[in-house]
């Protein structure tokens, strides 16, 4: 499983493996889990390709795709 951390303030869309130490998909006042809130969201995906496609279809002009440099998820 993959988690995509969409952060509106920075424009980063960072993809993590579920087991990554930086993967912390938790509901907050400003960020949702599998739903958008004011500062973005965490979304779960079954594959790298599905997460990347979601980014391509939903990104804004200033959005940046960035796989995590710690867990290093890659396309198969």
Residues covered by each model-derived region:
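Mature, structured domains enriched in cysteine- and short glycine motifs
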Residues: 1-76
């Amino acid at each position: 499983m993959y988690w995509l951390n969409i952060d509106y303030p920075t424009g980063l869309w960072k993809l993590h493996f579920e087991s990554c130490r930086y993967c912390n998909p938790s509901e907050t006042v400003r960020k949702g889990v599998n739903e958008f809130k004011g500062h973005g969201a965490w979304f779960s995906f079954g594959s790298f390709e599905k997460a990347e496609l979601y980014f391509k279809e939903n990104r804004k002009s200033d959005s940046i795709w960035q796989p995590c440099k710690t867990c290093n998820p890659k396309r198969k």
